Amino acid sequence: NMMADEKKLNLTLRSRTKGAPEKVVEKKINWEAGKTALIICDMWDDHWCKSASRRVGELAGPMNAVVEAAREKGVFIIHAPSSVVSFYDKTPQRKLAKDAPFSKSPIPLSVKERWGTNWCWPDPKYEGVLPIDDSDMGCSCKGEKCEIREAWTRQIKTIELVKGDALTDNGQETWNLLAERKIDNVILC
């Protein structure tokens, strides 16, 4: 059925095992688009690290194309620009996140702030380690690290925020949105 196929996401998952990290494991899956959310995390308009800012600029256009394609298939889009959601306080996307009915999460959500922001530390009881070392707050410049400064004010404009999308940097609000829509699968970008 052509219409049913259009609402499916045919994906290849790639992972590595702790025992053999050099070996890539691939698995083909099919997800229902309507039971899938795509979360865009920390694609800010600027970064105090020059290399991070450059990477966001390079990724934003292709990421927006992926977001548009996912949205067209029926994937729910959540924008999650940590620590700058107040920029969006009066938007319908922010209202959608704030108004989602409360839903208790199956495990406690992390509430331990990281670097004085809403960005929470991963909880090793439930999550693996990040694939990068972010102990320096995200600078990957060679040699001398960039000076930390207040840099981001919003999500980069290249990634479109449209009607039906949500915007939050709060774990409980995110869980509420996912539960309300009976989302089974999440793609984190």
Language-model features: locations:
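Acidic/histidine-rich, surface-exposed loop or edge segments in extracytoplasmic proteins
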Residues: 36-51
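Basic, amphipathic N-terminal segments that precede the first structured/catalytic domain
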Residues: 2-22
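Short, intrinsically disordered, charge-balanced linker/junction segments flanking boundaries
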Residues: 1, 186-189
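Proline/glycine-enriched tight loop/beta-turn segments at coil->beta junctions
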Residues: 31-34
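Short His-Asn-centered micro-motif
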Residues: 41, 79-81, 189
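Active-site alpha/beta core segments
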Residues: 28, 61, 65-184
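Second-shell loop/turn segments in exported
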Residues: 48-57, 160-165
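Structural motif
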Residues: 36-37, 185-187
